[in-house]
Amino acid sequence: MYLNGEIGSLEEVNVYAASTFYSIDRYISYQTDWSRDCKEGRLILADRYTTSNACHQMVKLPQKEWDGYLDWLADLEYTRMGLPEPGLVIYLDMDPNTSRRLLEKRYGGDESRKDLHEANLFYLLSCRGAALYAAEHWGWKVIRCCDGSDPYPPEQIHQAVLVEVDAWLRRQHPAESDGF
């Protein structure tokens, strides 16, 4: 409902309300789908976890409020809701103009297929700035995915991700690091 604009525009939906929609969705997913695996120590790979919510919502606030929002979101999800805090976050940094061209290709030029966020280039540019800010605030690894106009080949991005994951796994399991 939110991404389709059914409850209001980006500007009309309160940042904390929108964040809570996603937080509750993550909580339900955790409780019903993957909490057992997490508690048993299995490696969980997530796309668009709390970190994505942070980037998309904090841009709606004045920048002077970003640190407070990030602290609030971490407290809500990791402390109050008990969701697991990520051990490693890799932000794939793609220039929004390049991303927009890729989306146009994916959707065959049909603008109606874009969600509320994808349809707004200024918003996407703002989200990238917010993501880079959050990466610094929370200590994420940032991997550039384009040269400013063209995306890097998927194999190159994949290799950069593997380097970061391998380094993280070696730090987490030093006795087993020869097996990675």
Predicted feature descriptions by range:
Residues 1-75, 80-81:
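ATP-dependent small-molecule kinase phosphotransfer cores
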Residues 36, 44, 87, 171-176:
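Short, polar/charged, Gly/Pro-enriched helix-capping and turn/loop motifs at alpha-helix termini
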Residues 39-40, 84-85, 136:
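Short loop/turn elements that form and flank the Walker-type P-loop nucleotide-binding site
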Residues 45, 88-90, 141-143:
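Hydrophobic/aromatic beta-strand patches that form the interior of the parallel beta-sheet core
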Residues 51-129:
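A glycine- and Lys/Arg-enriched "phosphate-lid" helix/loop adjacent to the NTP-binding pocket
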Residues 97-180:
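NTP-dependent small-molecule kinase module
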